[in-house]
Curated annotation (Swiss-Prot):
Highest classification ranks of the organism: Eukaryota, Viridiplantae, Streptophyta, Embryophyta, Tracheophyta
Cofactor dependence: Mg(2+); Mn(2+)
Cofactor note: Binds 2 magnesium or manganese ions per subunit.
UniProt organism field: Oryza sativa subsp. japonica
Catalytic reactions of this protein: O-phospho-L-seryl-[protein] + H2O = L-seryl-[protein] + phosphate; O-phospho-L-threonyl-[protein] + H2O = L-threonyl-[protein] + phosphate
Protein name in the entry: Probable protein phosphatase 2C 18
Positions annotated to bind Mn(2+) 2: 165, 384, 425
Composition bias, Low complexity: 468-499, 638-647, 776-789
Ranges for region Disordered: 460-509, 564-599, 623-653, 675-804
Pfam annotation, one family: PP2C
Subcellular location: Membrane
Length: 804
């Protein structure tokens, strides 16, 4: 069977489980003489594909003498009727030009409406959880494929995830999804050298496709009715001259796979499918780089050296959005692709003058190994449909924010797949979430007490190596000990388990430990133990419970961080993906400080924590810039420095960090003062900290104001509005509010009437009427019992209840 018909049949087969559309029945009139003679003659000389006439036995086919004039070996056919069936289809495969144009034209039509139905699967174990979702979108057919396997074998803790983005058809991608991980398990280095095994599988997959068409049995099984009948029965028997199998010429697939074993993950990829890691705080890290001539100088150079040229940049409009696509690598018959590495696509790998690694397209993967640490949050493995619409940092930031909002991982994955609709391509996304506590942090925590014990053991005053006793298995001396030292001298590098000391004279500044069992002041070590005398310039990157080191414990100084001992790097600028409660570029620490002074409520709690998480994730902890960690005071201005560093007094602390954390404390406690203040009144606070006058107050504009009994401030005075009878004057509450607009005086029929202000200074209620309100007990005149009686109706505006 000719490769054209095989390609045509394979295009109709659906590897995603959908029904295969039957062969298109059409009348094909191929006007051969319309093709320029120069093209015909050059094509014949190239001889890339032998011309042939394919006939179906259940159709009636004619061939005119005009065709015989241009077809080599035309004497094999006579101009007669070749069949006597009721229907006719004439399919001419002349250098695959005519039919290739037909297939290309039909495929570019795509779908007028997107296929938005999604296929989503999720599974988890005690260490990881994954979600995979895929959608056809606006693609003319689904050419993406994937594989997600939590347990790849029965003997090792190995998980496998792979995304395969097919082009020119779905069959190569489908084959990779079904066979790639099996080839990996069967490789001889699978148990001993997983990295090498993964690298070799990329090449073996390419070789399997090129050797024979047996791989298609996985894609088009025997029970697929008419497809297998056409392929293995009818069509194969109508061309009696067998041809060498060449593999899928213009069909291929990318591959981006991740293998997780123990606390390691190995990422291998070829093409433009991508793997991105999110570290703590939403920091995006690309674990793969796209193999495209447009974005990679080395890839572009290889493609051009092999004869590939750029066809230019095409700006295609998809659903009111413009998507930029650059076509590269001009093939023999106008075929082109946008990537420079893939599995398959053998039309671009057959230059006999070049080595395998010099071809226009190669299958060589990039392989990277990474340790999985506790600060890693999740992986995103996706096809180009997603990355055409969103950058890596945007995808990670989106997932991070949605997780903080409590959205399920399944919903997030489907939202990402939906966003790929704008690219006009198929989209497949795999999210792999690392469960908290399942993996170790990069720096393990050490028990300070245990280390102090070890330190005291080596703080001996005995003689040097010659007189000491060796406590380990070494026959001669401790590892790293200076054998040339003599008794009474200091020696560097003693093993921690040794019972000998640095010399009879005790420790010194150059010894591993001083005589008190503490770390020496100038010792440069890579970890941090529970010592109270760490070196001044030591870069501490973990959260160990020490006295004055950055830690997540309840401190007396700030919420979660000892601000008087830590200085934020003034050059640090958070990444753009850190979400804040306002718009604009990411602020520097000095800008944050100015912001806090101007508007203390601008940053909310989550903004501050996200910014701090970003620093810790990117730098492995807050950058400590030389402050002594041995301070005995929490006040940076009055601290007594007990260390040996040059920055004595601990007096150069960046105020931005203290103020930022004060805001954080305000959100949590409802108070905005410096944490170590002794009062909650901003105007009368006795400040015990170092920022007198700078602490954040509740309301500077109401300093000294008293509060009402319902919590409201009342005009900076000491009176309180009675909230039990709002607006009603009574004699039991001094200073009750009265309505200045009232025109009705008090009377006994309307107890609680608003009182006319002029009346309250010159008359009180008469004493012979019960129930009336005493308006002003200090009035200069008293109502006479017979002079004026309250009007029962209470309507006279001049009724003042008596005359003065």
């Amino acid at each position: 069977m000719g490769p054209l018909l095989e390609r045509w049949i394979s295009r109709e087969g659906r590897s995603d489980g959908g029904d295969a559309s039957g062969p298109v029945l059409f009348w094909c009139v191929l006007i051969i003489f319309a093709v320029p003679d120069a093209i015909r003659s050059s094509s014949l000389r190239l001889g890339q594909v032998a011309p042939r006439l394919v006939l179906f036995s259940n159709f009636k086919a004619f061939r005119s003498p005009k065709f015989a004039k241009i077809l080599p070996g035309s004497d094999l056919f006579s101009p007669r009727v070749l069949g006597f069936r009721t229907r006719v289809v004439l399919l001419l495969d002349v250098f695959e030009v005519g039919f290739a144009l037909f297939c290309k034209a039909s495929s570019t039509m795509g779908n007028s409406l997107p296929v938005e139905s999604k296929v989503t699967v999720e599974e988890e174990n005690d260490r990881i959880k994954y979600i995979v979702s895929s959608m056809q979108g606006l693609g003319h057919k689904m050419e993406d494929a994937h594989a997600a396997i939590l347990s790849l074998d029965d003997t090792t803790s190995t998980s496998f995830f792979g995304v395969y983005d097919g082009h020119g058809g779905a069959e190569v991608a489908s084959y990779c999804a079904k066979r790639f991980h099996i080839e990996l398990c069967n490789h001889e280095d699978y148990h001993n050298d997983l990295t090498n095994a993964l690298d070799n599988v990329f090449f073996s997959m390419d070789e399997n496709l090129q050797q024979s068409d047996a791989w298609r049995e996985l894609v088009i099984p025997r029970d697929n009715g008419w497809m297998y009948f056409l392929k293995a029965g009818v069509c194969a028997n109508f061309w009696p001259f067998p041809q060498a199998y060449t593999g899928p010429a213009y069909e291929g697939s990318t591959a981006c796979v991740v293998v997780i074993r123990g606390d390691q993950m190995i990422v291998g990829h070829a093409g433009d499918s991508r793997c991105v890691l999110s570290r703590q705080g939403g920091l995006a890290i690309d674990l793969s780089s796209d193999h495209k001539p447009r974005t990679s100088e080395s890839e572009r150079e290889r493609v051009q050296n092999a004869g590939g040229i750029s066809l230019g940049v095409d700006c295609e409009k998809v659903m009111e959005n413009y998507v930029i696509k650059e076509q590269w690598i001009l093939g023999y018959f106008g075929e082109s692709v946008t990537i420079s590495r893939s599995i398959g696509d053998f039309a671009f790998k057959q230059n006999k003058d070049l080595n395998r690694e010099e071809q226009m397209l190669i299958c060589d993967p990039d392989i990277h190994t990474h340790d999985i640490t506790g600060d890693m949050e999740f992986l995103v493995i996706a096809s180009q449909g997603l990355w055409s619409c969103m950058e890596s940092a945007d995808v990670v930031a989106y997932i991070h924010v949605r997780l903080l909002e409590g959205v399920e991982l399944r919903v997030i994955c489907e939202e990402l797949v939906q966003s790929g609709l704008a690219s006009g391509e198929n989209t497949t996304v795999i999210l792999v979430q690392f469960k908290p506590g399942a993996f170790q942090f990069q720096y393990e925590l050490v028990d300070p007490a245990a280390f102090d014990t070890a330190a005291s053991n080596v703080a001996s005053t005995s003689a040097g190596p010659a007189g000491g006793s060796d406590s380990d298995t070494s026959a001669t001396s401790d590892e790293g000990v200076d054998d040339t030292a003599t008794a009474g001298t200091t020696t560097t590098g003693y093993e921690a388990g040794s019972s000998t000391g640095p010399g009879s004279g005790g420790g010194s500044a150059n010894a591993a430990f001083d005589s008190g069992g503490d770390l020496a002041a100038n010792l440069d070590i890579a970890t941090n133990f529970g010592s109270d005398d760490l070196a001044a310039n030591l870069d501490i990157a973990t959260d160990i419970d020490t006295e004055d080191v950055f830690t997540f414990i309840n401190s007396d100084d700030t919420f979660g961080i000892n601000s008087d001992e830590v200085e934020l790097d003034p050059n640090f600028r958070p990444k753009p993906q850190v979400r804040r409660a306002h718009d604009g570029p990411s602020p520097t620490p000095s800008e944050i400080e100015a912001d806090l002074n101007a508007s203390p409520t601008r940053y909310n709690m989550r903004d501050i924590f996200e910014a701090f998480d970003k620093v810790e994730a990117e730098l492995g902890g807050f950058p400590l810039q030389g402050h002594d960690v041995s301070s005995t005071s929490t006040n940076p201005n009055t601290a007594t420095d007990t260390g040996s560093g040059s920055r004595t007094g601990d007096d150069d602390v960046d105020g931005a960090i203290a103020r930022a954390m004060a805001v954080a404390s305000s959100v949590m406690t409802g108070a905005g003062y410096e944490v170590d203040s002794t009062t909650t009144n901003p105007s009368a606070a006795a400040d015990t900290g170092s920022y007198t006058g700078d602490e954040i107050k509740v309301d500077d504009s109401t300093s000294g104001s008293a509060r009402g009994d319902s919590g409201e401030l009342v005009n900076n005075d000491t009176t309180v509005a009675d909230n039990n009878a709002s607006g009603v004057a009574d004699s039991t509450t001094v200073g009750d509010e009265v309505d200045p607009t009232a025109t009705v005086a008090a009377d006994d029929s309307n107890t609680g009437d608003k009182v006319d202000p002029p009346a309250i200074t010159k008359a009180t209620a008469d004493s012979n009427t019960s129930g009336e309100v005493d308006v002003d007990a200090t009035a200069t005149a008293t109502a006479s019992a017979s002079a004026a009686v309250a009007d029962d109706e209470g309507t006279a505006p001049d009724d003042s209840e008596g005359s003065p």
